[in-house]
Amino acid sequence: MESQQLSQHSPISHGSACASVTSKEVHTNQDPLDVSASKIQEYDKASTKANSQQTTTPASSAVPENPHHASPQTAQSHSPQNGPYQQQCMMTQNQANPSGWSFYGRPSMIPYTPYQMSPMYFPPGPHSQFPQYPSSVGTPLSTPSPESGNTFTDSSSADSDMTSTKKYVRPPPMLTSPNDFLNWVKTYIKFLQNSNLGDIIPTATRKAVRQMTDDELTFLCHTFQLFAPSQFLPTWVKDILSADYTDIMKILSKSINKMQSDTQEVNDITTLATLHYNGSTPADAFEAEVTNILDRLNNNGIPINNKVACQFIMRGLSGEYKFLRYARHRYIHMTVADLFSDIHSMYEEQQESKRNKSTYRRNPSDEKKDSRTYTNTTKPKSITRNSQKPNNSQSRTARAHNVSTSNNSSGPDNDLIRGSTTEPIQLKNKHDLHLGQELTESTVNHTNHSDDELPGHLLLDSGASRTLIRSAHHIHSASSNPGINVVDAQKRNIPINAIGDLQFHFQDNTKTSIKVLHTPNIAYDLLSLNELAAVDITACFTKNVLERSDGTVLAPIVKYGDFYWVSKKYLLPSNISVPTINNVHTSESTRKYPYPFIHRMLAHANAQTIRYSLKNNTITYFNESDVDWSSAIDYQCPDCLIGKSTKHRHIKGSRLKYQNSYEPFQYLHTDIFGPVHNLPKSAPSYFISFTDETTKFRWVYPLHDRREDSILDVFTTILAFIKNQFQASVLVIQMDRGSEYTNRTLHKFLEKNGITPCYTTTADSRAHGVAERLNRTLLDDCRTQLQCSGLPNHLWFSAIEFSTIVRNSLASPKSKKSARQHAGLAGLDISTLLPFGQPVIVNDHNPNSKIHPRGIPGYALHPSRNSYGYIIYLPSLKKTVDTTNYVILQGKESRLDQFNYDALTFDEDLNRLTASYQSFIASNEIQQSDDLNIESDHDFQSDIELHPEQPRNVLSKAVSPTDSTPPSTHTEDSKRVSKTNIRAPREVDPNISKSNILPSKKRSSTPQISDIESTGSGGMHRLDVPLLAPMSQYNTHESSHTSKSKDFRHSDSYSDNETNHTNVPISSTGGTNNKTVPQTSEQETEKRIIHRSPSIDTSSSESNSLHHVVPIKTSDTCPKENTEESIIADLPLPDLPPEPPTKLSDSFKELPPINSRQTNSSLGGIGDSNAYTTINSKKRSLEDNETEIKVSRDTWNTKNMRSLEPPRSKKRIHLIAAVKAVKSIKPIRTTLRYDEAITYNKDIKEKEKYIEAYHKEVNQLLKMKTWDTDRYYDRKEIDPKRVINSMFIFNRKRDGTHKARFVARGDIQHPDTYDSGMQSNTVHHYALMTSLSLALDNNYYITQLDISSAYLYADIKEELYIRPPPHLGMNDKLIRLKKSLYGLKQSGANWYETIKSYLIQQCGMEEVRGWSCVFKNSQVTICLFVDDMVLFSKNLNSNKRIIEKLKMQYDTKIINLGESDEEIQYDILGLEIKYQRGKYMKLGMENSLTEKIPKLNVPLNPKGRKLSAPGQPGLYIDQQELELEEDDYKMKVHEMQKLIGLASYVGYKFRFDLLYYINTLAQHILFPSKQVLDMTYELIQFIWNTRDKQLIWHKSKPVKPTNKLVVISDASYGNQPYYKSQIGNIYLLNGKVIGGKSTKASLTCTSTTEAEIHAISESVPLLNNLSYLIQELDKKPITKGLLTDSKSTISIIISNNEEKFRNRFFGTKAMRLRDEVSGNHLHVCYIETKKNIADVMTKPLPIKTFKLLTNKWIH
């Protein structure tokens, strides 16, 4: 606005420059209203300082900081205008002003404002100047500038000093709104203060210091007019100005008062809202304070009505006065006076009670007689958590005040109900009654009454939020509710047995009920006034009655002692009994930690010790109530049963007669354990333990030997530690009489330090019980930890140290404290603890290369003693490190799931437990660049030699006779022949192919499993109790772990625990590195199998129910309850048998160690649970050896005639290079050439059949006019690139007929001779399987057709020439093609376009979009595969009509019309199908396999044992380089091509259970080691043994006319080379398996969840395409389901929270998956891992697991 004014009017005529005024901003935290004399000098100094820092010159003017300031412009001189005030402009400075005078000094034109028309307004003349003040001392405005030293005198002097540097004060902003006037006044007052006019401004507390002058008044008026336009002034300001325009000071004074009044109002409201009164001050003072506040607010125009005022007052009441909240909050017409009357009454009664408190004080001797857990010396308060509320991070809080004694003081915590001024009913004893009340004791025998309790009455409690009662006699509708936990004021838990209703029947026949909690662990029955108020019942202590809000009296109140009571006669009894309450089944709370998890977390300590520790806070972070103890009583830990098996218990208290009482750390017990044999040299063989007699604090130290100096070093260390850390001196050390303690060196050391050695007497083992029991306990823990984690034996002392840390933190049942508490140390924070052996990933600070993985798999051992880190074992580095740079590996539970643990994993519990600690670590981490070489905090403590441990029973290696026979090619001459070594590059592209499932270079594996000590009798004691207790409450997440060994075989016996095996490698017994494990019978075998994903376990009675598959419902994907049931129904899922009790055989001895190999195989791989162990035995069941192939391939060269020749050059093959070259393999030739079939064929009969087939083919070619027979071309006349070589090929068809085919050599066809954009389409196998499945469900007729010489019906557009057939004898001539000859690049596409056009135009068909070669109309569906057609229709006549039309154009043969109602056999595209309409369909290849497999020259074992699985877990492909002769290598590759080619053909047709093994071996075609060949033979042997198996379909009988398409997905995390994951999917239509896929993930996944997401995302596109196909072929509605055993994946899919995807590698894929699931209406359901049939697609499985998952759909 100001800029516009400057541009519209001419500048003033005086001055040569227009300088902008700037100043330093005044601090915003300074209050401009504080204008007291003490602040004036401060503002003056600030103004002077600000002015001294700003300069303005004519050449450069400062940019104005105020947006209302005019931009600097050059002033121009003009002659004065005629008449006064004809120009308007902003008041501008024409020259610099002296310090102390701001914003005037030269004539200025002030713009007119409406109120300038006032008669009181006196405008200045055009040449008049602003007032000038005389330069006198003491005048603030006349202070000369320190820079110039001049005083502002006149305009001429000012003009002469125009160029001098002056300081200016920032003007106030323009007023823009009436609502902002008070804020503007603040800035205006600040402006006046900075202009040295602060002393003329009055404040709310004092008048102005001096009177203003006329010049100052003119200045105020002009500046006020300038910056406060009248249109923006408030009404009250305009009223003042209308009366006296110059009364600016009145406006400022009133504004200051208003602002201070507003501040006081805010303070009053804040004080009123934060009132607090507990009786510590007189009630009169409290009333006066509140009344004054209410009066001030009312006077300031803020009236507070009675209701609001009472609410403020009641909110501030605490202590005993809190009761008034409940007594008065229901009153509608409540007044402040009434409320204060009650407060005065309670205050007077409180004072009276204090004076007479000795009368009611409880006798201290009576307190000692109270033997209850809750002594009730103070009032306990209870906190209630309702775990049934999902997504509620804050617990519900309840206060249950349990009072048994009178309170000695008043305060906020003493929430008792006091009497009023009216005399209450006083009972001096239990027999004294008033008001005619009857004290009738309930017939129920109460427990634990307090002496001051009034029997038969309920204690009224004003502070309790819940009602508690000890007897079940009055509880209605009782049910257990363990989710509600109550604690008293001392934070002690009050166990709650049940929850129910407490029903009242009052004296006016009023009936009501409130909720009540049942517990026998309280001193009184508590009645919560809070819950009574919720049902409109209040306690009036002036009348001593319970009444309703309308004043209706319900029951009298009795005062007995210090408390108020209500009789139980108003309670209605129930029929429930106390045993019924106590025996109600406790349901599982999902928010609680399962006891097995805590049991394992705390080193497998017993439940009693853990409970004592949690109750006494020796274990911190969570409470006893946070653990589900429902299974603790009958829970049997299998690892504890094995690791802690003992003969008998020690005698308790046996040492008391040998010693006196000592102070802490004065009496120590010590003992040495060892040696432990068969360990690396770096691992300790002994340990020495110390136990303090008083505190029971334990220390353990490792020892490598028992020499004197080693023992002395430990004693020196422990004594110094106790002296420095605990300021104590050891007086006595009790030891046995071992030589390590009785030697002279140690004796002198003890004597020198004044320590008395106390030795045990001979044959008195009881005297040394403390040390012996500690060693036994620690060893039990050690065995249990190693058994549970599966870590190698050389880490045994780490398990001892972990146990010691935990044991020192567990409370003793006898002392109720832990050793750490006795020693004065803080409790152990369990959030910093990890389970022993927990898989983690440790950051590699210095990798081998920038592309090398930065994470190293490891296993957590125990917290570090020397840092805040954790000791972690890294198998790949053979080290233990001390580091904080680790991440817990999700889904990994080491060997926790070995015994199934009732199908428990604890990922969610562990995440929840360590969340705060991890967040603390994360918040204190320093971000560092990955490219910098920074010193790591890794402390490599020991170099561990990881050589395999030798088992105690040496295993003999089984060698077949052929194994000892050396190959005939390895002769003396071969050593003298030079070798041509060919090496492949070491590093190759990891993405070799879509199904790359090969081992990479050696990586770390799971360390070997420790041996288990046998008992003295040579075997484990037989356990008559089951090792496993079913716990169906717990859900689990996917978990996988790696453990590698070659010493594994299948076990014939099988328990339900094995159903979760995953990622178990293929095994073979023929390899050179294999070791044969002695046979073990079923009765003598203990299954030790690591599960991939322990799943939800249910009770045996529900093993066959649908509850094994738990659907996850969402509003988007599952709109109806029965949708999930319909999806799961009819699926060929396995029926899980009930889990039998697992018993250990008497002959059970010891487990052989797992010989860990540092490899990463595709048949198991790192991160997978693929290890299991059998027990050594001389016997072995028949099925245990069924995967063994006795025929060795060492006789290979005996069949080769070239073996008689001198050895040739050898070729060295590297595994990775061979894998990379797999995709470039040329297919092997399965047909015969002309010379092989006819010219040189010595089989006369076969030769004649081939000749007949040859002539038949030639006649067909001539009949179809395949080439131009009118002219033969000379070869020289034709462009060579248009000449196509041709040949005859011969083969024998499946039906036994001999076939000849004249084909072109399309493999050498020039690119210019065909259109590369044309596609040769055939029906997709999934389309065929879908059509077959729909045909079975809809009773379709299936007709099979064949079109002879189909390609020859398609014309060829290009100009191509071929050589004539051989029988014509014209080798130098060429003929021009007219038809699409077989073999040409374009022939398939030409035929496809030809037949497609005919079917659409002539037969009325249409092709299904997205599914080539699938045609349909309203009646018929056609699947086309080159020249084979399969027709499906409801009416057979529809098929016949299509056939007639086809015969009109093509030579069509009906292979099978399909008109019979009996079983019909088809041979469709290699599948042998048995079909009976409306009943079943069976798909197999028995006849074809019976014919083909024997011709493969595979060493079959037809009379031997049959294989029960395609491969066995435990063996890894040796990655060492091969060195083979060139010819030998080519022959083996050729054989591998034949074998894998046949297996792939079978697997992708219908044997989907073999796809994992097929894909794995397919990657090793160019790496034909003896091991790979033997594994391939084993696969072919299994196919041969199961050649009669069929894919079985039965007609579905859906409840609704709908189709159900389901995909079951699974992933095996990180079990492939380069840490890639294997994914597998199985597709089912109406419960029938129609396809499967097993492949390696295209990207490296970082977690099991990401692998599962990748697997599901790979399945969704095909699922959607199949859905479209089904809807096109069958117009029924379709339901699409997606089943996975990963709950975390389901949670991500159904969640609407997108923040969890941030900083996640799989965020994009997960978001896309969520969109696809939502957009395509997919129903995402959970399936147990035990029932996940897709498991066979991702990993090798044990025999019984494999059978269990496949026997319902392949048999």
From Swiss-Prot:
Q: Where is the RNase H Ty1/copia-type domain?
A: 1610-1752
Q: Which residues form the Reverse transcriptase Ty1/copia-type domain?
A: 1338-1476
**What residues correspond to the site Cleavage?**
H401, N402, N582, N583, A1217, A1218
Q: Where does Mg(2+) 2 bind?
A: D1346, D1427, D1428
Q: Name one GO biological process term.
A: proteolysis
Q: Which residues cross the membrane?
A: none
| Active site residues according to the UniProt entry | D461
Assigned EC number: 3.4.23.-, 2.7.7.49, 2.7.7.7, 3.1.26.4
Entry comment, domain topic = The C-terminal RNA-binding region of CA is sufficient for all its nucleocapsid-like chaperone activities.
Q: How does it assemble?
A: The capsid protein forms a homotrimer, from which the VLPs are assembled. The protease is a homodimer, whose active site consists of two apposed aspartic acid residues.
What is this protein's function per UniProt?
Capsid protein (CA) is the structural component of the virus-like particle (VLP), forming the shell that encapsulates the retrotransposons dimeric RNA genome. The particles are assembled from trimer-clustered units and there are holes in the capsid shells that allow for the diffusion of macromolecules. CA also has nucleocapsid-like chaperone activity, promoting primer tRNA(i)-Met annealing to the multipartite primer-binding site (PBS), dimerization of Ty1 RNA and initiation of reverse transcription.
Question: What is the protein name for this chain?
Answer: Transposon Ty1-NL1 Gag-Pol polyprotein
